[in-house]
Structure formats: C-alpha cells, structure tokens
C-alpha cells in the first residue's frame, strides 16, 4: 500500500513516473525531453508532458503567477509540436523554498482564475525560489 504522506511529498514529475499506463495502452512509441519538460507518446495517441519551471525572485507571491503562465505556455507548445489536438487533463501546482530558509509557507496554490498565490511569513519572507510543477495529458488525432 502506498504511504500517502510520502506520495504527497513527491513532485508531479515523480508522480507521473508512478502512474500506471491507462488501460489499452501498452507501448511508448516516443519519449524525450524538451527544455524543462519530459514527454511520452503512447501507441493509442495519448501524450503526457510533465516537468517543473522554477526561479529565484524577490517577490514570490507576485512572481508565481507569471511563472505559472510560462509553465503553461511551454508545456502547451510541446503538446502542439507533438500533434496533440485535445487536452484531457492538466495539473499545475506551486511550491516554494521560502526566503533563504527564514520564511514559513502558509499556503501555495493556483486558483480557478489561473492566479498563483503564495502566503509566507518570516524575515525576508518574500525572497526565495518559486517552482511550478505540471503534468498534462492530451491526445493526438
């Protein structure tokens, strides 16, 4: 049985590697990397793209939304290059290391309007590394 706490601490990239192939899929016909992204194309036309985009910044809460948009555009560009015509699922998450180890992250999430939020407290709380993890599945026609 999977340890839920252990699973929740993994990045989306690691989770993508743990996922079993959907039923009816039995072979990867193409796989590789493009920039920060990894991708797999399955024999039934299913395409997976996952990875992480991160950056150091002085204003984590305001910078996170821009970084999320970059992650989304990069991953969708790869899907387009691979011939994907339909997005069947997309997962994005935001995380941070906090400000030089002196900040506490209260919450980090992406809301329904595609705005990333990071709430931190502590000295130098606004400075640190922001990371956007993503896992997207689409289909080729």
Language-model regions: role of each:
Residues 46-141:
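Extracellular attachment/recognition segments
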Residues 1-54:
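Glycine-rich, low-complexity segments
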């Amino acid at each position: 049985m999977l340890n839920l706490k252990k699973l929740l601490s993994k990045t989306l990239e690691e989770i993508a590697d743990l996922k079993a192939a959907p039923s009816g899929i039995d072979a990867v016909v193409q796989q590789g990397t493009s920039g920060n992204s990894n991708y797999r194309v399955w024999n039934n036309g299913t395409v997976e793209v996952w990875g992480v985009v991160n950056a150091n910044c002085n204003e984590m809460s305001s910078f996170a939304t821009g970084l999320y948009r970059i992650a989304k555009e990069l991953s969708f560009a790869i899907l387009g290059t691979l011939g994907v015509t339909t997005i069947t699922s997309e997962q994005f998450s935001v995380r941070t290391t906090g400000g030089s180890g002196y900040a506490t992250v209260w919450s980090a999430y992406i809301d329904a309007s595609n705005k990333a939020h990071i709430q931190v407290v502590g000295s130098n709380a606004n400075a640190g590394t922001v990371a956007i993890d993503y896992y997207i599945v689409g289909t080729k026609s």
